[in-house]
């Protein structure tokens, strides 16, 4: 007999309206993300601007509302002036973060054109590593000021009359990391970010800022960094950045799927730190979170080290090309559940990255088409069906033991209510690798609703991957959920991602 779990989903248990930007992503000038990724002139599937139409279509399928650009570590040695103006006059640069050669063929204008085609906004990251206040202000003037000044007129001269109106700006990237070009102490960075934000707001009061938090929760200055940086910047910024990546280097799948609990704890700790600074400053303002780098990342580490150490200074080398397996898709689904459950404070999130570089979308390096990695599907489902109000489910689940995270629940879930569309979606993962779970869900508050579909992503092989022309992992629609007198009975197969959708009976 299958194990049993119980859950209550009630429209009164509201967490927050979900900001659609939590389904954002990230494109860095790194590896084949830009060149041979979004941009490949001469390819039979590219448009007149050189952008891959098949890639744009897949990004639209994911429905990515915002894309962080141009980095990442890349941005801390980025000279934005190199990326504008006539392409033939743009210089090649040594790209120090990834020991590559940047040709600047795709720059601000080109990327904005691509983002428009993909129905995405651009979240601009500025260089506070090797540069500072003056250059950040010049870049903002170039992008957002209407005209009549040096840099806004330069934009017009370059063929863009109307300002771009970029709204969301990152004040550097991972400035606590010793690997960062221009790495700073917490107070050095806090003061620089504070003064940069103040100056930029004088140019465009409508913009909002993301300030760098810790690069991950294992950094030696974790939490102390947030305290010091926010003590300087709290009154001037809108979001604190979080980053995390997980891997399964020990090949312990059971413990690997517990790492979403670590992400949940990370967010709780950051919220507590933000609220401590809020109290210290006697502020009435909440600090929101931008989880602008998150994913699984470890498969490509050895190959990446070989390229950067033994074959440096290439244009678009195949860096960070993780090929994701099925268990990676399960963890990505679990991480999405965590983000939705924290939608009261997490307002922006970026799956890192989008194309070819630790990405849901890959392009064939031999000139072929594009394909979907296993992680494409949980992200697509969450982005497509996770719009509305996040509901906090009350879950009673059986548990199992892990090697590094103690006893964890078999079932992790969250629900989203889209009142406008009259839809309820439950996202659930059975992370028990051996046993199916019957999930009984009380949905009596949604009177007149019926089961529309139960989508499942599952595989008997946790290590199976997709490849160009070979889609081994893809979702299917099942009959595994029934409804009777306001209670759902759902069979959650072992190691499965589940999307259970309810709609109003008149639809």
How should each PLM-predicted stretch be described?
Residues 243-259:
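Active-site His/acidic residue clusters
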């Amino acid at each position: 007999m299958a194990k049993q779990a119980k859950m209550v989903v009630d429209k009164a248990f509201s967490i927050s309206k979900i900001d659609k930007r939590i389904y954002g992503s990230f494109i860095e000038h790194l590896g084949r993300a830009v060149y041979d990724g979004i941009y490949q002139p001469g390819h039979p599937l590219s448009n007149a601007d050189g952008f891959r139409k098949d890639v744009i279509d897949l990004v639209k399928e994911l429905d990515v509302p915002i894309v962080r650009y141009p980095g990442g570590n890349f941005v801390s040695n980025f000279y934005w002036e190199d990326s504008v103006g006539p392409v033939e006059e743009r210089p090649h640069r040594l790209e120090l973060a990834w020991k590559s050669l940047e040709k600047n063929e795709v720059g601000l204008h080109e990327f904005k054109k691509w983002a428009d085609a993909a129905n995405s906004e651009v979240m601009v990251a500025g260089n506070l590593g090797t540069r500072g206040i003056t250059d950040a202000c010049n870049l903002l003037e170039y992008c957002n000021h209407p005209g009549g000044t040096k840099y806004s007129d330069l934009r017009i001269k370059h063929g863009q009359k109307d300002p771009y109106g970029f709204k969301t700006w990152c004040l550097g990237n991972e400035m606590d990391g010793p690997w960062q070009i221009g790495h700073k102490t917490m107070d050095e960075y806090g003061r620089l970010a504070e003064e940069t934000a103040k100056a930029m707001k004088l140019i465009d009061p409508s913009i909002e800022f993301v300030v760098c938090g810790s690069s991950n929760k294992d950094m030696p200055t974790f939490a102390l960094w947030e305290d010091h940086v926010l003590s300087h910047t709290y009154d001037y910024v809108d979001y604190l950045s979080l980053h995390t990546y997980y891997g399964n280097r020990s090949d312990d799948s059971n413990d690997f799927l517990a790492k979403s609990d670590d992400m949940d704890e990370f967010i709780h700790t950051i919220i507590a730190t933000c609220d401590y600074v809020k109290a210290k400053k006697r502020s009435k303002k909440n600090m929101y979170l931008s989880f602008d780098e998150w994913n699984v990342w470890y498969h490509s580490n050895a190959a990446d080290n070989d390229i950067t150490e033994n074959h440096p200074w290439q244009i678009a080398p195949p860096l960070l090309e993780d090929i994701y397996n099925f268990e990676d898709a399960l963890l990505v689904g679990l991480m999405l559940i965590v983000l939705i459950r924290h939608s009261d404070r997490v307002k922006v999130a970026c799956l890192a990255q989008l194309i070819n570089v630790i990405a849901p979308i890959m392009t064939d390096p031999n000139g072929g088409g594009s394909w979907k990695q296993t992680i494409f599907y949980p992200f697509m489902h969450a982005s497509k069906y996770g719009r509305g109000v996040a509901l906090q489910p009350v879950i009673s689940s059986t548990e199992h033991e892990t090697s590094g995270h103690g006893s964890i629940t078999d079932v992790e879930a969250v629900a989203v209510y889209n009142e406008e569309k009259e839809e309820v979606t439950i996202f659930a993962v059975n992370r028990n690798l051996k046993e199916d779970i019957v999930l009984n869900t009380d949905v009596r508050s949604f009177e007149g609703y019926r089961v529309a579909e139960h989508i499942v992503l599952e595989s008997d092989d946790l290590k199976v991957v997709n490849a160009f022309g070979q889609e081994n992992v893809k979702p299917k629609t099942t009959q595994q959920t029934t409804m009777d007198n306001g209670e759902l009975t759902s069979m959650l197969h072992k190691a499965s991602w589940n999307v259970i959708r309810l709609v109003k009976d008149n639809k």
